[in-house]
Amino acid sequence: ISIEEFKKNKKIIEKLKVKLTLFEMLTLIYCLSASKLKNVSYALVEAGLLYAKDSTRLWDQPKCQIITNINQQHLEWVKPKTLQAICQQKVGYLSKKTTIYIGKQEPKTKKIIKKILRKNPSKKIYYGDAWSLKKKGNCRIYKDKKGKLVLKSNKIFSDGIWQNVGLAVKVARDFNISKKN
């Protein structure tokens, strides 16, 4: 989104005279901008931590929902201050009519997520069951039922970012999104 388009959409929203949080304002600006795009098949929308009340809960039946690594970095935002509370906020309110991709988690976190999602009829695809990502030298080896891919980057130094890349590759492959897109 260009700065000009951002400012234009911000003015449109401000005319509504509706009190919005910064996150709600940014979400609405994104949605207005995305609605004007041509030849776009998918929109990636990142939800906030407190998904139960998140402004990105706009779609009843999204194509998919993606859960990246959940850890205790969000403790200050939830009550009670537990991993269970974080997981409940992140996965407890997901659509019941979608496919949910769950990235690599610590065993305790994965157990909590599975328990929360037990009542959700959506299809679930878990790291370790449907795909994996292994470090080999300076690259990563992605593997799923379609085969292996060698992923290389001299700009990614974080294992967490690599896990997100692997998760994105899984979704892209499942949706038959080509490498050039």
Task: Please annotate each region the language model reported.
Residues 1-60, 69-72, 76-81, 85:
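ATP-dependent carboxylate-amine ligase catalytic core
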